[in-house]
Swiss-Prot record:
UniProt keywords, alphabetically: Lyase
Catalytic activity, EC: 4.2.1.-
Coiled-coil region: none
Protein known as: Putative hydro-lyase cgR_2449
Species assigned in the record: Corynebacterium glutamicum (strain R)
Biological classification of the source: Bacteria, Bacillati, Actinomycetota, Actinomycetes, Mycobacteriales
SUPFAM superfamilies: PSTPO5379-like
InterPro entries per UniProt: D-Glu_cyclase, Putative_hydro-lyase, UPF0317
């Protein structure tokens, strides 16, 4: 199975059938997305949180309370279901992780408002096309992710620290990585930090908070991008009564072409 050539519809069907694996490298050319669903009475707070923190929380679409599919799935929108079509989910109650199921159907409520947020997996295909190596993708692993010491701007009852994803990039190609990813602001855009991880509160780069440990080659430099797992750090900090999210690195694959998010 060549995961890069699988259509978004086929990918969602496989995940709906129970396949659990990270989605880096899947359905090349199409945007991937983070998910967070929260009770309607917290929806405005989260919308404001995202507006105040656009690097980690670039909103692609907001669904009405109870809705389970959106326009980002294109002509296949009615076929898609955000409760089943990510490979794995996380269920939080009062900030505690209580389950990591393959389907969120059993926890779904009609008052949940869902936010679909851009994911940096979207710009990995353009990076590869330009010859910039993406180490975790090459190895079939999940991207490393870390909670930093950088506080997000709070909104209402919601607050938390920035989460970043890491890609080890050859020093000679860091400028290329910045140039390529800066053209995709809707999926986190340019890096937020390059170099010494301790400057953003990461004590051990080999022990990520989410995902797999990083892979590197001699001459690689750590490059960090804002990450859509930031809302999960916010959930753990703010402790809302219920939140449903994707599992880190296990994204919703949309029908939106990645070039649609590229700016000049």
């Amino acid at each position: 199975m060549n995961r890069s050539t699988i259509s978004p519809v086929e990918a969602r069907q496989q995940f709906r059938a129970g396949l659990i694996q990270p989605t880096s490298g899947w359905s090349a050319g199409f945007a991937q997305a983070n998910l967070i669903s929260m009770p309607q009475d917290l929806a405005y707070d989260f919308l404001l949180f995202a507006q105040r923190n656009p690097k980690p929380c670039p909103i692609l679409e907001v669904l009405n309370a109870g809705e389970t599919f959106g326009g980002i799935f294109g002509s296949n929108a009615t076929e898609a279901d955000i409760r089943t079509d990510a490979p794995q989910y996380r269920i939080y109650e009062h900030g505690e992780l209580i389950d990591s199921p393959a389907s969120a159907v059993d926890y779904w409520r009609d008052d949940l408002v869902s936010f679909i947020i851009g994911c940096s997996f979207t710009f990995e295909h353009p990076m590869v096309q330009a010859g910039v190596p993406v180490r975790h993708l090459e190895a079939g692993r999940n991207v490393p992710m870390y909670e930093t010491s950088l506080a997000c701007r709070p909104a209402g009852s919601l607050s938390g620290n920035l989460v970043v994803s890491l890609r080890m990039i050859p020093a000679s190609q860091v400028a290329d990585a910045v140039r390529i990813t800066s053209r995709y602001p809707a999926v986190h855009g340019a890096p937020v930090h390059i170099g010494d991880p301790s400057l953003i509160g990461i004590d051990d780069i080999n022990n990520p908070d989410f995902g797999d440990a990083p892979l590197s080659e001699p001459g690689d430099v750590p490059v960090f991008w804002a990450c859509g797992v930031t809302p999960q750090a916010m959930v753990m900090s703010s402790k809302p009564p219920l939140a449903i999210t994707h599992a880190p690195g296990h994204m919703l694959i949309t029908d939106a072409p990645d070039l649609g998010f590229q700016v000049p």
